[in-house]
């Protein structure tokens, strides 16, 4: 559960309505893979990830980034039940993929950076604070099934 004020919830929802999930998702996942290259080991089937340009232009990275932000959108619609919303994804990432749960926090922070880049002055400190709460809540929910 993420505790947001009414104003924070409104700010998150208003900005998210303007997000191009495909563009932002691809950029966020791509940046994660470039900035934290050890995360690439989970995406070996994606082909060429040898350079930042290769990562950022990789169609599989873009497609998976869109999928990730689709799940994030579901989370925004269920802020009062993030653990339930992400239970299956948590189990998948824990039991089958063996993803370090710290990677969820890293991706959330990268997403905040990408949103700031895309929305400039509209991404005020207050909006950032609200999004930081949301990405922390999502990361916590995704890590929930870990032992």
UniProtKB/Swiss-Prot annotation:
SUPFAM superfamilies: Globin-like
One Pfam family this sequence matches: Globin
Record-listed N6-acetyllysine modification sites: 60, 83, 145
Recorded GO MF terms: haptoglobin binding; heme binding; hemoglobin alpha binding; metal ion binding; organic acid binding; oxygen binding; oxygen carrier activity; peroxidase activity
In-chain residues carrying the UniProt-annotated modification S-nitrosocysteine: 94
Tissue specificity field: Red blood cells.
Keywords for this protein: Acetylation, Heme, Iron, Metal-binding, Oxygen transport, Phosphoprotein, S-nitrosylation, Transport
Residues modified as Phosphothreonine: 13
UniProt-annotated binding residues for heme b: 64, 93
Residue(s) carrying Phosphoserine: 45
Domain Globin, residue spans: 3-147
Result, substituting residue 77 to T: In allelic sequence
GO biological process assignments: hydrogen peroxide catabolic process
InterPro entries: Globin (IPR000971), Globin-like_sf (IPR009050), Globin/Proto (IPR012292), Hemoglobin_b (IPR002337), Hemoglobin_oxygen_transport (IPR050056)
Record's keyword annotation contains Heme: yes
Modified sites of kind N-acetylvaline: 2
GO cellular component, one term: blood microparticle
Keyword NADP: no
Recorded family membership: Belongs to the globin family.
Quaternary structure annotation from Swiss-Prot or TrEMBL: Heterotetramer of two alpha chains and two beta chains.
Protein role: Involved in oxygen transport from the lung to the various peripheral tissues.
Protein name: Hemoglobin subunit beta
Organism: Saimiri sciureus (Common squirrel monkey)
């Amino acid at each position: 559960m993420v505790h947001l004020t009414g104003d924070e919830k409104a700010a998150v929802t208003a900005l998210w309505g303007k997000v191009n999930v495909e563009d932002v998702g691809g950029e966020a996942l791509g940046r994660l893979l470039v900035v934290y290259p050890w995360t690439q080991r989970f995406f070996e089937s994606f082909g060429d990830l040898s350079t930042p340009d290769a990562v950022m232009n990789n169609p599989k990275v873009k497609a998976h980034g869109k999928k990730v932000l689709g799940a994030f959108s579901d989370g925004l619609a269920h802020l009062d039940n993030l653990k339930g919303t992400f239970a299956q994804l948590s189990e998948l990432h824990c039991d089958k993929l063996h993803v370090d749960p710290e990677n969820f926090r890293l991706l959330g922070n990268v997403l905040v950076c990408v949103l700031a880049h895309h929305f400039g002055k509209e991404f005020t400190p207050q909006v950032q604070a609200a999004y930081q709460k949301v990405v922390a809540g999502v990361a916590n929910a995704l890590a929930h099934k870990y032992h």
